[in-house]
Amino acid sequence: MSAVAETIQTEMPSPILFTDSAAAKVADLIAEEGNPDLKLRVFVQGGGCSGFQYGFTFDEITNEDDTTMTKNGVSLLIDAMSYQYLVGAEIDYKEDLEGAQFVIKNPNATTTCGCGSSFS
């Protein structure tokens, strides 16, 4: 009698939520630049009124320590240091009466400033 081990593969949820709205806006911006190799890099750096601040830039290069996520054909890059601060976060794009901007909702942030781009 032979035993067959059944392997069940489950897809783990992404530790960072990159919304459809954010992916669509990034796709529009990449199309405007005319460079399909661009990826959105999201990072955390020291600064801002609460100690850390979020940053966004386009990058063509994926570094060895980057975590890469893809949503609707758009790639998001996060370096290893920033990743630890962004686990569980939602990266969204909002348009309202106050303007249009990328927004990060981060459950790891204990305090945030009024501008929403700085946290501790």
From Swiss-Prot:
One of the protein's GO biological processes: iron-sulfur cluster assembly
Protein name: Putative iron-sulfur cluster insertion protein ErpA
InterPro entries: FeS_biogenesis, FeS_cluster_insertion, FeS_cluster_insertion_CS, FeS_cluster_insertion_RrpA, HesB-like_dom_sf
Binding residues for iron-sulfur cluster: C49, C113, C115
Record has Metal-binding as a keyword: yes
Lineage: Bacteria, Pseudomonadati, Pseudomonadota, Betaproteobacteria, Burkholderiales
Species of origin: Albidiferax ferrireducens (strain ATCC BAA-621 / DSM 15236 / T118)
Keywords: Iron, Iron-sulfur, Metal-binding
Gene for this chain: erpA
Cofactor(s) of this protein: iron-sulfur cluster
